[in-house]
């Protein structure tokens, strides 16, 4: 009776454990489904990021080209203005004695203003290129961080799945032992027949011995 009670308690414990395991498997399936949805979303995001990366790369290349053109133009204009200023100064020094210095100063101011304007345009183009590069680096960093987080989540779910499988194996072993104890192996008929023959022989021997004594 004590063994039956212990077996009943063990069976109840196994049933509770099996129910918890079923709940854990259900939770794991739900989590796996959510992970699949998240992975699909991540793939879509990756595709969008790839498109964004391609677009940003094209914009960076275009802006870099424009910046190079603007810088080259600025250098050419600066060299041309320096040559023009030198020529004007030389020409006015030769032809107009009294007005040369005033006019040369005015022309120099105009040339400096033009040079400043060209340099400002070139600097603005360079700043825009740097801004686009920063945006690209930020998007790329966010993508890599998100991918790393999902990789950690996949590892955690894999560990949970392994623990559930190991728990299933540990639960199945006591259930098999309990089934064997509840259904013992029946004795062979030969064992019973041998026991009956032995008892019959002993009875006959006792009868013959009593006959001799009396």
UniProtKB/Swiss-Prot annotation:
GO cellular component: membrane
Protein keywords: Membrane, Repeat
Top-level lineage group: Eukaryota
Spans annotated as Disordered: 1-31, 180-214
Keyword Ligase found: no
Renumbered residue ranges of the record's region 4 X 14 AA tandem repeats: 1-56
Annotated Basic and acidic residues bias: 188-203
Residue windows of the Sequence repeats: 1-14, 15-28, 29-42, 43-56
Localization of this protein: Membrane
Chief subcellular location: membrane
First and last residue of the signal peptide: none
Protein name per Swiss-Prot or TrEMBL: Membrane antigen containing repeating peptides
């Amino acid at each position: 009776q004590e063994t039956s009670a212990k077996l009943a308690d063990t069976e109840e414990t196994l049933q509770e454990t099996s129910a918890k395991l079923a709940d854990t498997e259900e939770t794991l399936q739900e989590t796996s489904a959510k992970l699949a949805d998240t992975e699909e979303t991540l793939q879509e995001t990756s595709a969008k990021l790839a498109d964004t990366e391609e677009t940003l790369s094209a914009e960076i290349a275009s802006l870099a080209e424009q910046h190079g053109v603007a810088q080259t133009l600025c250098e050419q204009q600066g060299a041309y203005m320096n040559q023009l200023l030198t020529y004007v100064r030389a020409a006015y020094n030769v032809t107009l004695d009294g007005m040369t210095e005033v006019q040369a100063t005015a022309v120099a101011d105009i040339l400096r203003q033009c040079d400043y304007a060209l340099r400002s345009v070139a600097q603005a183009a360079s700043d825009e290129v740097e801004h686009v590069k920063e945006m690209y680096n930020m998007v790329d960093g966010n993508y890599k961080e998100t991918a790393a987080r999902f990789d950690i989540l996949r590892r955690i779910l894999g560990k949970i799945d392994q623990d559930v499988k190991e728990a299933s194996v540990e639960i199945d072993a006591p259930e098999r032992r309990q089934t064997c104890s509840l259904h013992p192996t029946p004795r062979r008929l030969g064992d019973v027949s041998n026991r009956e023959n032995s008892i019959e022989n002993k009875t006959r021997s006792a009868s013959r011995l009593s006959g001799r004594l009396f």
